[in-house]
Amino acid sequence: MNKINTQLENSMNSAIEFLAIALNATGHNSKPVLLHSIRVGFYLYKKGYNQDIVLGGLLHDILEDTETSINDLNDKFGIRVTKIVAANSFNTSIGDKTEQFQDMFNRCKEYGKEALIIKAADIMDNSNYIQFVNDKKTINWLLFKMKSFINISREEIEKEDVWKE
């Protein structure tokens, strides 16, 4: 294994440990956030994306699902990872859930390809759960959310592996 992969894997271990500790201390999402975040990060790693994208994928839910601050995240993982994670996080001051998603998708687009790649991997992983939803209204809302993301991100990431899957 070359030095770059070893460094990346060490950083991934640090991110997973940081996330697990934060979720244990303050996590307030009943979904299996840790496993979801690991799947997203490892998917991006296997696809050969850079360190900022992989770490951003591992940590993409940490700001909205724990009490971790932007400053703590920045101190541990740097400004680029922090900005990618912030772009992928809900603005909780927006009350309407659809508006929260639209705002997040727009911030991902503003940040650029790295944030959009992570959001695509996140949505792809979450889409595996749609089969367990029995409520037609929820299914329609989830499909609307996916279509909205596709529309906003197509131009930026349609040539990326994450888009093709």
Walk through the language-model features, giving the residues of each.
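Active-site helical microenvironments for divalent-metal-assisted chemistry
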Residues: 1-165
